[in-house]
Design a protein with these regions (language model features):
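Serine/threonine-rich low-complexity intrinsically disordered regions
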Residues: 1-6, 30-33, 46, 227
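Sec-dependent N-terminal signal peptides of Gram-positive bacterial secreted proteins and lipoproteins
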Residues: 2-28
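Active-site-adjacent loops and short helices of periplasmic peptidoglycan-processing enzymes
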Residues: 29-197, 201-210, 215
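Extracytoplasmic
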Residues: 203-240
Length: 240
């Protein structure tokens, strides 16, 4: 096991931390001003009785949550709404693992492969291409592949909109307080938001799943040749 993977599992086995510079819901005058304002935001956990003082961070919101118990160790504006972007895919993977076997085959639709924004994260799959759920999850979690998020959503719920319903039901089940999903890949939508506290809950639940830990903890994955692509594709983990 490589050093990075060893470190990854060492970290998630004890404490899970989310410290995210989410996309702000309001735009500040300049990047410098926004960054400084974020740094100067109060840290709620510093006001707790008999609790150690935590550091200031430049993230708009932050949380440190103990992975086993869910105990909050550090909190900074943790329930504020933010746009989650690609960390949405943690929930996409969690809902997928709740509903699918890894060896199920998915035929990628035209909508799944062609509705994503030009230049966004992708592994260049095409209409009619067949991948398994497991292969799609590797591409989702290592390469943040947006067409794979769409294909998983359609495979499970018939449409991305209906899959978002499942995502929101899962969020409610986990106790999320300020989350609403409208798609599976995290591409911007005004009605697609979450908060640091909720993402900690979602990721804590995901890390309890052995398949999620295995897939998201890999350094790389080799995608086999498919019915539409004659060559293998090496997918590298872009997230650490």
């Amino acid at each position: 096991m490589g050093f990075r993977k060893h470190l990854f599992y060492k970290l998630i086995s004890g404490v899970f931390a989310v410290s995210l510079a989410f996309s702000p819901l309001t735009v500040q005058a300049t990047e410098i001003t926004e960054s400084q304002l974020a740094y100067e935001k109060p840290i709620e956990s510093n006001g707790w009785d008999s609790w150690p003082t935590g550091p200031s961070v430049y993230a708009q919101s932050a949380i440190v949550m103990e992975a086993d118990t869910g105990m909050i160790l550090y909190a900074k504006d943790m329930e504020a709404k933010h746009y989650p972007a690609s960390i949405t895919k943690i929930m996409t993977a969690l809902v997928t693992l709740d509903h699918c076997e890894l060896n199920e085959e998915i035929e990628y639709s035209y909508h799944a492969t062609h509705s994503i924004e030009y230049g966004s994260s992708s592994i260049a799959r095409t209409e009619g291409e067949i991948l398994t759920v497991e292969e799609s999850l590797y591409a989702l979690m290592l390469a943040s592949a947006n067409e794979c998020a769409n294909a998983l959503a359609e495979h499970i719920a018939g449409s991305i909109e209906d899959f978002a319903v499942l995502m929101n039901e899962k969020a409610k089940e986990l106790g999320c307080v300020n989350t609403h999903f409208s798609n599976a890949n995290g591409l911007h939508d005004e009605n697609h938001y979450t908060c640091a506290y909720d993402m900690a809950l979602i990721t804590k639940a995901a890390l309890e799943n052995e398949d999620f830990r295995r897939i998201s903890g890999e350094d790389y994955y080799t995608l086999r040749a498919t019915n539409k692509n004659d060559e293998e594709l090496l997918i590298q983990n872009h997230h650490y």
